[in-house]
Amino acid sequence: MGRLVQAFKFKPFSRKQKKILTWWLPESQVHEMNGIIADGAIRSGKTVSMALSFVMWSMETFSGENFGMAGKTIGAFRRNVLKPLKLILFARGYRFKDHRADNLLEVSRNGVTNYYYIFGGKDERSQDLVQGITLAGFFFDEVALMPESFVNQATARCSVEGSKWWFNCNPDKPKHWFKVNWIDQAAEKNLIYLHFTMDDNLSLSETIKERYRRQFVGVFFKRFIQGLWVAAEGLVHPQFADKAKAYAISSVSYTHLTLP
């Protein structure tokens, strides 16, 4: 399992995070849905709650099954998802073995053991990595950064009865394949859809949230802060057009300029 030198400090879960963590429970009215999509702003608390929910669901529902987890690259997934996830699992009484050579996480608790294969979905060739394997579920982190062929191949591998999908991402352009084929068709695919903002992450202080709000403008504000699927076309920085005089340079004195 390896030595964990830092303890995970739990913060209160927000209402939407609690939905992510509990939608699959038998007493939930939506537990028979095929999966869940969480999109929205950066730093909004999607990733950790989605990853934890995925493992909790799989450990409560199956034993001895294979599951898939993916980021754009394996390195990014290990850094952004697996590192904090392992701390949380350890704190909640799970035990695990990380077989790094095989990119396999073996998780055990109360006599139940399941196996989680880690994939990178960085290009069209990535679909070959998941061919042939039979899975009981798949978790996609930053799915909008992956090619559609990889996601189609990975979801098709989930043929075990009761298998489900977890997707989370930050938004991209409105015609992005995941927006068009999955979010816009969530009802038809029998998927839960939740939209997140920074206010859904109770671990962020108002000071930090305000700093992020001031950091981005234009299309980047709409995507990163509001979590909207907007196109980077036309006025990327509309504040310049709205206040042209404030940014205009009326005159420049070239007399005092020193050329190299």
Where do the model's predicted regions map?
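Pre-P-loop entry segment of helicase/translocase ATPase cores
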Residues: 1-34
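Residue-level preference for the first positions of well-ordered beta-strands
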Residues: 35-37, 66-68, 116, 137, ...
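Conserved P-loop
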Residues: 35-100
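Walker B catalytic acidic pair
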Residues: 142
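ATPase catalytic-site recognition across NTP-hydrolyzing enzymes
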Residues: 201-257
